[in-house]
Every structure is written in C-alpha cells, then in structure tokens.
Amino acid sequence: MAKLYYYYGAMGSSKSATLLMSAHTYERQGKKVLLFTSSVDDRFGTGVIASRVGIDKDAEIIGRNDNVVELIGDTTGISCIFVDECQFLTGEQVMQLSDIVDNDNVPVICYGLKTDFKGELFEGSEALFELADSFNEIKTTCSMCESKATMNLRTNNGKPVKTGNVIQIGDDEYFPMCRKHYKKSFL
C-alpha cells in the first residue's frame, strides 16, 4: 500500500540533495518517477530541483492555483512522485497528493521546511503533518553550536529579522539554528 511521506528539516539540511539521490535510486532500478517543485522557489531557475552541493534535475512546476491531480494526470507506470519545496503547497494541494496515494496507489514523497523564519508552520507543512502517513526529520546542526537545528533564522544586512513577508527574495540570508540560539539572536 502506497503512503504519503513528509521529509522535513531546517535550512541547509540537504533536503533537496536527499530527494535527488532517492529519485536517482528509483531511476537506476529502471523505475519511472515524476519530480515536482513549487513555482515559488526559483532560486536556481524555474522548474529545477537543485542542491547546494551542485546536483540538480529538471522538474515540473506546481503553481499556487494548480490542481495537482489534473497536473499529474495518468499515473500508470509511475513508481513514485517526488515533491520538493512542499511547504509552499496549499492545504488543498496536499489533500490532492493524498488522493493520488489513496486512489492510484502511488507513493508520494514530499521534502520541505517545517517552519518559516518566524517559527510558524507553512500551510503546506501543516497540511502534511495532518495528512502524511510517515514523517521523517532530516537533521542538521545549528550555525552557532553543535545542537540540532530546528529553526530558520533570517538576516538582512547581518541583522536578525522576525517580521515581513514569509517569502523573501533579495539580500536576506537564512541560517539553521537551535531554538536557544534562535531566541538569543533577538535579545
């Protein structure tokens, strides 16, 4: 029986690299996979899943208004569907992914952030915690210590930012942080 999987972690935890390696394993075994990413993430170009370690692969784009079931279409012969940057999906789109799992018996493996720079769940993350069959944390360490990073610190011109739009393109940088150092950043 297929499942809906959610792999989540802080910034820099190799989520995209893990997705690409998993998809490669399927393909090396002769299995057909579909790769998707959110239209919101265009850091490496549109329709590309890319890792900071230098590996990338083309992917289909899921727009905010897309019906995922219609976008994917016929799943005959598909062994697995991979979705990167799933935190940017809507709750309805996550529900549609669960429909594919339940109705077509095709596993869907989603990768993304758990929370934004404010420490709040993204809409897609929240829906995945409600609907996924399996949750797996991809761990990384805090930028300031050796503790596990669970938060994402946004900085602008080297100063911590806790307000503003959730999706920010420009001069902002993000750092994986443990809760203790995340909170200390604002003191």
Where in this protein do the model-derived segments appear?
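Conserved P-loop
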Residues: 1-72, 116-127, 140, 168-187
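Conserved RecA-like ASCE ATPase "motif II neighborhood" in helicase/translocase motors
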Residues: 60-82, 91-94
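Walker B catalytic acidic pair
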Residues: 84-86, 112-113
